[in-house]
Amino acid sequence: MAIVVQKYGGSSVATAEKIKNVAQRVGKVFDGGEQIVVVVSAMGDTTDDLIKLAGQVTSDPHPREMDVLLSTGELVASTLLAMAIKNIGYKAISLSGAQAGIKTDTTYRKARIVKIETKRILDELEKGQIVIVAGFQGITDDMDVTTLGRGGSDTSAVALAAALGAKICERLTDTDGIYSADPRVVPNAFRLDEIGYEEMLELATYGNKVMQPRAIELAELYNIPIRVASSFNDNPGTLIHGGVSMEVRNKVRSVAYDMDVAKISVLGIPDKPGIAASIFVPLAKAGISVDTIVQNSSVNKIADLTFTVTKDQISEAMKVAKPIAKKLGASDIVADSELGKVSIVGTGMQNTPGFAAKMFDTLSANGINIELISTSEIRITCIIKESKVKDAVRALHKAFEVEV
């Protein structure tokens, strides 16, 4: 029998009734002759509630203890789902990440999966069990519990699918697939039947929150198809895979946006080797992730350097960058947190002229000023004022007549 891995998000298991609904769906897959491994997230807002609870105890929780605490959310969901499945007549067993053989490195709160020892899961499947695995977690060689970071249950599911040789990983959530744009912003946005790994990775990185980028990278590496569908209806969803037939057809595949953008500009710094490194190395050591970087052409060997970070890191980034800017003799350093970004994505854009020009012209025609630009072979991203982002999404979706 083929193995199917299903992953249910927090909204799908948020209440007892929803857990019972998931149990019924899992049972139907089992009845179809598949061996099934189910990965679950914590119920609803459990993870956020646990973080708040820790904050009431201490302002500086130890990373190891936080991982132990946060891992309990998925344990609750997995055990309740196993109970619900047993209650309707199936054999089921819940496993923690450790019991499932998920081994990680020692980077608490953002651990990476090193390997998965699949013997326990395979043994349980051979016994006719439906295996429920707590997502988002693993264990180190020293038997310490770790968590995989936000969205880590997606990573758990895809990694398990790869290790088990599953035929597919199904990501069941409160949305019924990947859309040409956010349907809450663009009412006539449509669901995509399929999308390539490369396109999906760009969308996930630049604003589409349905799947985590790490999970997409893993899926592409091990060629694991992912079906994104709703846990509340039977719509077929969107298949994420490596189908080469899509490359020629898709021009602009989807429009994505992200409101979590802040900008720092270091003005009037010397334009010479080592200046950028003197700024970005300390930022990296402080755990600050930098996205778009732009340096203007120098005048009299003086230039301005601008980069973006997430809004929650702007204060820490300024704290790190200010003394460096002063040491470099910068004329000023300024921050702007009222920004967002909008991106167009599609493999058909590769080596095809005109997309950037059309995007910029569309934004200009709608009175939207572009602050920064970044690109890849299949993506163009513009940093703009936060208040204009949704207008930009609607305008671009219409201008490019985004294709099915």
PLM feature spans:
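A structural alpha-helix within SAM-dependent methyltransferase catalytic domains
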Residues: 23, 27-30, 162, 220, ...
